[in-house]
C-alpha cells in the first residue's frame, strides 16, 4: 500500500482527529533515565537531541509553574519484581534500583520538588500511583515526552486516552533506539491516541495557559 493509499484509508476511517485540550496541563517525562538516553547501556541510545528539546520544554513548563512528573524503570537486585517483561526483554535487568541507569538524565535539570515515579511496566499507569497524583493536582491535560516511542510512550499514550486525558506528544521530545519503530509509532499515536505536535506548538500551548491563569512565562 502506497503512502497516498494509507492516507486515504485513515481519512475514510476518520482517524487522527485533534483532541480538545484543557486548562491545567502537566508535563510527563517518561523514562528519560540514563539507561535509555546513554548508549553505554544495552537498552540505551544517543537521545541527546530529544533530551535537549525536552529540557527546553520543561523550562517553559517550570516558568509557568506547571506540574512536572518523571518516571523511571527500576527492578530490585533479585529481579523477582520483573515479571514476564524481563524474559521478553532481558536487557531491562540492567535497570536496577539504586544503579546509575535508573537515574533521571541530569541534563533535564530535575528539581527536588518534581515527582519521580518508579515503574516496572511499560505504561506509566501500570502498578503506579500516577492516577492519584494527576487527580490531586487537578491535571486535565498531559504533554508527554520521553522514551521509547515504540514502548513506554505508546503504552502510556493508550492509557492516557483510556483515563480521559487529552495528550500532546512533541515529536522532538520523544525518541527510540531505531528510527523505523519511532516513526511507525508516532504515526499510530497521532492516528488513535494523542496529538503529535512540534515542541514549539507544545510550548505555545503552555504559554497560552499561563497567560490565562496569570502565571509568569
Predicted regions span which residues?
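Glycine-centered short loops/turns at secondary-structure junctions
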Residues: 63-66, 138, 164
Amino acid at each position: 500500500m502506497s503512502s497516498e493509499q494509507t492516507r486515504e484509508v485513515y481519512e475514510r476511517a476518520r482517524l487522527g482527529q485533534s483532541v480538545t485540550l484543557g486548562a491545567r496541563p502537566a508535563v510527563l517525562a517518561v523514562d528519560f533515565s540514563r539507561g535509555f538516553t546513554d548508549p553505554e547501556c544495552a537498552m540505551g541510545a544517543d537521545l541527546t537531541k530529544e533530551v535537549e528539546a525536552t529540557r527546553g520544554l520543561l523550562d517553559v513548563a517550570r516558568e509557568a509553574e506547571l506540574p512536572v512528573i518523571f518516571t523511571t524503570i527500576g527492578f530490585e537486585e533479585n529481579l523477582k519484581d520483573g515479571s514476564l517483561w524481563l524474559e521478553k526483554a532481558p536487557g531491562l535487568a540492567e535497570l536496577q534500583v539504586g544503579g546509575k541507569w535508573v537515574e533521571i538524565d541530569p541534563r533535564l535539570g530535575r528539581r527536588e520538588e518534581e515527582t519521580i515515579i518508579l515503574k516496572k511496566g511499560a505504561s506509566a499507569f501500570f502498578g503506579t500511583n500516577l492516577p492519584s497524583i494527576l487527580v490531586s493536582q487537578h491535571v486535565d491535560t498531559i504533554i508527554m515526552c520521553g522514551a521509547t516511542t515504540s514502548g513506554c510512550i505508546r503504552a502510556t499514550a493508550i492509557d492516557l486516552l483510556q483515563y480521559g486525558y487529552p495528550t500532546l506528544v512533541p515529536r522532538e521530545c520523544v525518541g527510540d533506539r531505531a528510527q523505523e519503530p519511532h516513526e511507525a509509532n508516532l504515526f499510530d499515536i497521532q492516528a488513535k491516541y494523542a496529538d503529535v505536535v512540534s515542541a514549539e506548538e507544545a510550548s505555545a500551548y503552555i504559554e497560552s495557559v499561563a497567560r490565562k491563569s496569570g502565571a509568569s512565562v
